[in-house]
């Protein structure tokens, strides 16, 4: 009777595991797909949307003077125009979701091939439940693309280590090239991973792999070398001229910001999610260390070390040279962390007794599930925020094509991505690499003489102080949108009487 019950339990577990193995990528597509339906963009996403709206030559020029290579923007621009273009940017979000789906399929097939289906299911489960994946899934930035290619790089490296073939080396090399062209810190992660991979080859005396490794490494270096020169020049210029990133270097408080972003979200952190995420990481790391020791397989540890070293390198650079690192810059290596979590969870479940196993599973997955629900709900509220509709209604009813909209600095005018044909000005200075359309520097009031109405948009608490010499102002609209509280003022030119009255005021 006991044997029959055990067989029944094994049958149920096997079929449930098969159901999860097939169903988790579909669930991810549905859950993350909710982020690509709306048209809400925050500043960095609006920057990407403006980039893909530019002519090809201008796009390449800006990437050569900004922080990132054109690789991601080229992919995004092609996909954007393939989906019809326009000012509804669902296609931009969809591309990130599709690369996240590709990452899940790597977990389904490649992780299952290299480990087993159980590890594959755990890998996909934690990938779906970790809050940072919900934050980045629909983000119109290069992080999802870099996640896919760096994960492919790592898995193909382990596949080569087990049994090298020419095709595997080609996949490894191509994935590495795509990764280094995604983001500067994806480049750093790839370099660190290559170093650890070479160290492993030498320690394990796999001399037959050295030739392929060197060929792949030199190929990646040669292909990336033109942009490496650009990257170095950008970094030097930023150190020389960007006072904000050199005067305020990273401190211990910055480590907390990194943790907020890795375990929750830096803009909208949820305290309990951060704390539970750190606790979960410690528990699963304990199991992962035991798994590596018991199986004599250091592959998950090498991946986790790559992620950890990226955080350390980024933190050291930000604390000593230039405050340029943010937690999400390490996101491309999160696939390595999820593999670390997966083997750790498998080991904890395997080592647990019959009675305590259910508690381990329920406690671990319940904690991860709670973090997911809290963060996912927060992200959905942001994604479906109605502030954009308020702004669109205002533009439609109050603003004409012969109006000018002024902002005190770049972050206040990114909403122009929705109305690129209107006229925009930045007070006093415009960055040469700014991609937003029809945006100029406002140097003198005479530039505004031909406009029917003049508007000033800033964040709540700000006022049109730079314009008060020549204009009176009054609040026309206050609205909240995603992370921002905006105020729009109507500016009216001062009359001679207004100027006299202002001069007569006591100072």
Model-predicted segments: where are they?
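Short, Lys/Arg-rich, polar N-terminal cytosolic tail immediately upstream
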Residues: 1-13
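Membrane-proximal helix-loop-helix interfaces that form the catalytic/acceptor-binding platform
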Residues: 16, 20-350, 360-492
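Membrane-embedded catalytic cores of phosphoryl/pyrophosphoryl-handling enzymes
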Residues: 356
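Short, charged/polar, Gly/Pro-enriched secondary-structure boundary elements
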Residues: 495-500
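SAM/dcSAM-binding transferase cores
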Residues: 503
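Short, solvent-exposed mixed-charge patches
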Residues: 506-507
